[in-house]
Amino acid sequence: MQEITASELKTRLDAGDDIQLIDVRQPDEYSFAKIEGSKLIPLGEIMRRKDEIDASKETVIHCKMGGRSAQAIELLRKTGFQGELKNLVGGITAWSNDVDPTVLKY
């Protein structure tokens, strides 16, 4: 499974790279803290809503710590999803710690 760190993601976003961010946490978690520009597709809905993920774009999937996002990537791969998928190492917690301390931790 491909991975990307929060710092690497920030550098790529700042450079203007066209990266799709998918957040697989629950709606209450998303409303509390989110990475700007991310789209919420909770893990339990990922299979039903997989067509909302643009396979032509590099996609970074994240959750709180990286576990649910890894599950989401495995599920998508099992269905034959062909796009480039990366797991955000440490999830939104790493984003808050390493990139943007204004993103609340829980």
Regions found by a protein language model. Name each.
Residues 62-63:
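Short, surface-exposed ligand- or partner-binding patches at beta-edge/loop junctions that are enriched
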Residues 1-20, 27-58, 67-106:
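Rhodanese-like catalytic fold shared by cysteine-dependent sulfurtransferases
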